[in-house]
Amino acid sequence: AGAAFRARGWELEVVVCDNNSTDRTGAIAEANGARVVFEAENQISRARNAAGHAARGDWIIFLDADSTPCEGLFAATAELMEMDSTLGGGVVIRMECMPWWAQMGLWKWNMISRVFKLPAGSYIFCRATAFRELEGFSHKLFAAEEIEFDLRLNRIARRRGQQIHIIRRP
């Protein structure tokens, strides 16, 4: 991510939420320059919110620990961030080594994501002002919390005359 953002003269801050990890996530993240926040309750919404509320930038990218984005994704994201009309977005999901029937399910999700502008939880970006206006992800949900967040983000986008983008090919 650094190259795409630094090329534009932007500062990059990495905030990692340690949500009771047992694999030294916090120590590894700190050793690599990230700021680590801790969330005691094991819930993805709370972990995302802890990191999101700690972030100091104008934009927030939520990236799941098991996601492996390419540099092109960050470049495409940065291009969208430069546009005043962009409120947020995400990317279609790609997974390797899946059986055909699972690939069909993923294809269906990606279609729904593109049509309804619903970024998958594995990679969501949005303006920090929108995240704070929404008060983050709902603590009431233990699954599909990103869909509920996306729906509220879309409402703000419509109200502001902005857009949610789903990147197809980074």
Walk through the language-model features, giving the residues of each.
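Short, acidic, metal-binding catalytic loop of nucleotide-sugar glycosyltransferases
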Residues: 1-11
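A conserved acidic beta->alpha catalytic loop
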Residues: 18-26, 67
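Acidic helix N-cap motif at the loop->helix transition within catalytic regions
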Residues: 23-32, 72
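Glycine-rich, basic loop-to-helix element that forms the pyrophosphate-binding segment
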Residues: 28-31, 39-55
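Short aromatic/hydrophobic "clamp" motif used to bind/position activated sugar donors
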Residues: 60
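Conserved donor NDP-sugar-binding/catalytic core segment of glycosyltransferases
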Residues: 72-100
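A recurrent flexible, glycine/aromatic-enriched loop bordering the glycosyltransferase active site
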Residues: 88-97, 109-126
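A short, conserved alpha-helix in the catalytic core of glycosyltransferases
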Residues: 130-135, 140-161
